[in-house]
């Protein structure tokens, strides 16, 4: 018999039903479960696949550069970043009639094009790229890196180049390498690029390899570095009248602490950014020399953890046993990595708009909205993944004997308290927030809007005031003009910060009121509920009150009938599945809030948000309905415009989303009946019955149907909102 898919599981390969295909796809990446896998092989496979991942990333970014250089308008955009629309790539579509061709021919292009809302143009411009040739050079370099990564991946699968398990479990060496070698050196290299290429570029000086050694980034060269007069590098910064990309109003400083924004570009000062990266480089280069490797000096992580037992004994054996537990569990490590990355990605979303780092990106409203939404959704998926792998850790890798009475075991011991507290918080937030919204709706519906319950967020306003926002009149800390912190700030640190925070033209510490108070608590409800489901799923992964023996059932067991007391909806996978809906729900509220707040701000009528966001009909009517009106007129009986493709995607997104429910609101028997009916009809239909298949068609399992439903729900949800967001923003602001 020929080798059938999947080769990694002989048991599945011999399955006579279509289950073979679906289970094969589902477990293709679950290396641990494959036939003949060893711990060593597992680590080596994952390690080699990382290089493949890098190759894909480099190829993708190379493609971005290449297509903009080939089909974009980078050089004309550079001449006038505020009025030329950046082109991502051309559209070649044989289905476009003349009206569509005309509608999508924009940005000075000769034919239909896609406009770029990625912020790449602004980034490339800020870091010193100016010509298409620069973009082609970057694309070729990344293509070269992609090839190198593929070769490295292949190489590390060859017997001579496969690292041993001990190499993978050498935590100190890995930490030193990542901290110093990756973060430290790359931050230092980036500082070098900013100082030698980007900052001169922002002052009208074109530095490339041919003149790299002739142009001094700072008039004094390296002198101040060696004589300890580092403050000379901060002297003579760019003036407030500096025109970015020219020498007009330019200074000579390279490392500054100005604070605030460049008045023309509305982005952080490049010299501040360079200073930040230099500081980061220093911190990480030091951090990468802290752990004990070759010379017997420095910290041992195991010793650190073992010694870390708080006095008083209230935390039991604290961190004893944790080192081996983490170091021997890939899922624990992946969970930690995903949790960290998820938080960082969400922080990127928050900081990209409030402290825009790239020149002119703050004035490109659609890009701001797209980047915020993009990073928040990605953060949501990554964070739910962290808990999924936390649950798999408990099932596959957790050993109670090794972790007796340490912090991990104690988390499991008091999981009931954790779940009940999260449950209480979610219920409290949900009922009170909904109660306030509904009350306000009733008051408006009954014609007594003055009876709404409107709560000022005074604590949040006080925090904003403490950071320097004066409009609330709190007169505290940095908003107190005669306080020592305020006066020191004038000269000592970030003098531009207080000006920026009190200007109304940016998104720093937006003015907040009762509408913000309510939506803040709605988002808090979503966050707490998502967390409750995820934490419960992980803590109950090995066993719960109803089913104390889940270990051998694994991560994603389906319903097993009523015989065992019912196993429906109690696998760790079920918790992850439910949590993704809540995560999408929450990020929906987050992005609705951000977008509505900002479009009213950008249009100069923040009172619309302030007045309409205190009741549910306001959100539905004045945000969703009002802002989709332009979008759904992208095509109509009178013709088509440049929003038509987004209008079509809006419709298509709803369709995909709704398809999800067909898979979610059904059960296994339904699918089996459907498939038997289809197979019966097929076998009795002339011509069609000439086509046979080897595998007997069996129904999707409950878990599979839910996965298909979840995938459609998620993809449709994101397609729908992406189309709405981009079309409603670009339709208003061009």
Curated annotation (Swiss-Prot):
Which annotated residues bind phylloquinone? 671
Recorded GO molecular functions are:
4 iron, 4 sulfur cluster binding; chlorophyll binding; electron transfer activity; magnesium ion binding; oxidoreductase activity
Which Gene3D superfamilies does its entry note?
Answer: Photosystem I PsaA/PsaB
What superkingdom does the record give?
Answer: Eukaryota
The record, for PROSITE patterns, names: PHOTOSYSTEM_I_PSAAB
As for family, the record states: Belongs to the PsaA/PsaB family.
List positions binding chlorophyll a B3: 662, 670
**Species of origin:** Amborella trichopoda
**Cofactor comment:** P700 is a chlorophyll a/chlorophyll a' dimer, A0 is one or more chlorophyll a, A1 is one or both phylloquinones and FX is a shared 4Fe-4S iron-sulfur center.
Annotated transmembrane regions: 46-69, 135-158, 175-199, 273-291, 330-353, 369-395, 417-439, 517-535, 575-596, 643-665, 707-727
UniProt entry tagged with the keyword Cell wall biogenesis/degradation: no
> What is this protein identified as?
Photosystem I P700 chlorophyll a apoprotein A2
Catalytic activity, per the record? reduced [plastocyanin] + hnu + oxidized [2Fe-2S]-[ferredoxin] = oxidized [plastocyanin] + reduced [2Fe-2S]-[ferredoxin]
What the protein does comes down to:
PsaA and PsaB bind P700, the primary electron donor of photosystem I (PSI), as well as the electron acceptors A0, A1 and FX. PSI is a plastocyanin-ferredoxin oxidoreductase, converting photonic excitation into a charge separation, which transfers an electron from the donor P700 chlorophyll pair to the spectroscopically characterized acceptors A0, A1, FX, FA and FB in turn. Oxidized P700 is reduced on the lumenal side of the thylakoid membrane by plastocyanin.
List of residues binding chlorophyll a B1:
654
Topology versus the membrane: Multi-pass membrane protein
Annotated residues for binding of [4Fe-4S] cluster = 559, 568
InterPro entries named among the record's database cross-references? PSI_PsaA/B, PSI_PsaA/B_CS, PSI_PsaA/B_sf, PSI_PsaB
- Keyword terms of this UniProt record: 4Fe-4S, Chlorophyll, Chloroplast, Chromophore, Electron transport, Iron, Iron-sulfur, Magnesium, Membrane, Metal-binding, Oxidoreductase, Photosynthesis, Photosystem I, Plastid, Thylakoid, Transmembrane, Transmembrane helix, Transport
Please name the Pfam families in this protein's record: PsaA_PsaB (PF00223)
Where can this protein be found? Plastid, Chloroplast thylakoid membrane
According to its UniProt record, this protein's enzyme class is oxidoreductase
């Amino acid at each position: 018999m020929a080798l059938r898919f999947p080769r990694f599981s002989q048991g599945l390969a011999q399955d006579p039903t279509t289950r073979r295909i679906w289970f094969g796809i589902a477990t293709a990446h679950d290396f641990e479960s494959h036939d003949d896998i060893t711990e060593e092989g597992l680590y080596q496979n994952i390690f080699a696949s990382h290089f493949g991942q890098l190759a894909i990333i480099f190829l993708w970014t190379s493609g971005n550069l290449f297509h903009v250089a080939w089909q974009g308008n980078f050089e004309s955009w550079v001449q006038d970043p505020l009025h030329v629309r950046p082109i991502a790539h051309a559209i070649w579509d044989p289905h476009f009639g003349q009206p569509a061709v005309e509608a999508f021919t924009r940005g000075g292009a000769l034919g239909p094009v896609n406009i770029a809302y990625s912020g790449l143009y602004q980034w490339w411009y800020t870091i010193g790229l100016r010509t298409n040739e620069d973009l082609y050079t970057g694309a070729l370099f990344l293509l070269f890196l992609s090839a190198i990564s593929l070769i490295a991946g292949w190489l590390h699968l060859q017997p001579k180049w496969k690292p041993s398990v001990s190499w993978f479990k050498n935590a100190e060496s890995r930490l030193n390498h990542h901290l110093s070698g990756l973060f430290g050196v790359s931050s230092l290299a980036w500082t070098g690029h900013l100082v030698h290429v980007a900052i001169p570029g922002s002052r009208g000086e074109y530095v490339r390899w041919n003149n790299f050694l002739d142009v001094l980034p700072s008039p004094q060269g390296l002198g101040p570095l060696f004589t300890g007069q580092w403050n000379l590098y901060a002297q003579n910064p760019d003036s407030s009248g500096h025109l970015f990309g020219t020498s007009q109003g330019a200074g000579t400083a390279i490392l500054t602490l100005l604070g605030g924004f460049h008045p023309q570009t509305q982005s952080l000062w490049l010299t501040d950014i360079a200073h930040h990266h230099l500081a980061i480089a220093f911190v990480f280069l030091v951090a990468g020399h802290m752990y004990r490797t070759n010379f017997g000096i420095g910290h041992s992580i195991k010793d650190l953890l073992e010694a870390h037992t708080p006095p008083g004994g209230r935390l039991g054996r604290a961190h004893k046993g944790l080192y081996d537990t983490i170091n021997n569990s890939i899922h624990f490590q992946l969970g930690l990595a995903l949790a960290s990355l998820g938080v960082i990605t969400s922080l990127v979303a928050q900081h990209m708009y409030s402290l825009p780092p790239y020149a002119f990106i703050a004035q490109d409203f659609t890009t701001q909205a797209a980047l915020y939404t993009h990073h928040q959704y990605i953060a949501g998926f990554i964070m739910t993944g962290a808990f999924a792998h936390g649950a798999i850790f408990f099932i596959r890798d957790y050993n109670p004997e090794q972790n007796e009475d340490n912090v991990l075991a104690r988390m499991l011991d008091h999981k009931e308290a954790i779940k009940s507290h999260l449950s209480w918080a979610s219920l409290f937030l949900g009922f009170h927030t909904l109660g306030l919204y509904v009350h306000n709706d009733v008051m408006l519906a009954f014609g007594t809007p003055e009876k709404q319950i409107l709560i000022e967020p005074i604590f949040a306003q006080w925090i904003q005031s403490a950071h320097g926002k004066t409009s609330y009149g709190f007169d505290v800390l940095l908003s107190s003009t005669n306080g020592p912190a305020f006066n020191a700030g004038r000269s000592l640190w970030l003098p531009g910060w207080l000006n920026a925070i009190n200007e109304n033209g940016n998104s720093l510490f937006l003015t907040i009121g009762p509408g913000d108070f309510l939506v803040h608590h709605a988002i808090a409800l979503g966050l707490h509920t998502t967390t409750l489901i995820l934490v419960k799923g992980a803590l109950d992964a090995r066993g719960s009150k109803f089913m104390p023996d889940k270990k051998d059932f694994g991560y994603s067991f389906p319903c097993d009938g009523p015989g065992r007391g019912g196993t429906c909806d109690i696998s760790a996978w079920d918790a992850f599945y439910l949590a993704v809906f809540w995560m999408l729900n929450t990020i929906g509220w987050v992005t609705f809030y951000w977008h509505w707040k900002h479009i009213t701000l950008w249009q100069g009528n923040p009172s619309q948000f302030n007045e309409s966001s205190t009741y549910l009909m306001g959100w539905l009517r004045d945000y969703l309905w009002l802002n989709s009106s332009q979008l759904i007129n992208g095509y109509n009986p009178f013709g088509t415009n440049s929003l038509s493709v987004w209008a079509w995607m809006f419709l298509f997104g709803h369709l995909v989303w709704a398809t999800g429910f067909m898979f979610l609101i059904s059960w296994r028997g339904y699918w089996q009946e459907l498939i038997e009916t289809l197979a019966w009809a097929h076998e009795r239909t002339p011509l069609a019955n000439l086509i046979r298949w080897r595998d007997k068609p069996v129904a999707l399992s409950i878990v599979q149907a839910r996965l298909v439903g979840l995938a459609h729900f998620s993809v449709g949800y994101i397609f729908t909102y992406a189309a709405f967001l981009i079309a409603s923003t670009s339709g208003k602001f061009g």
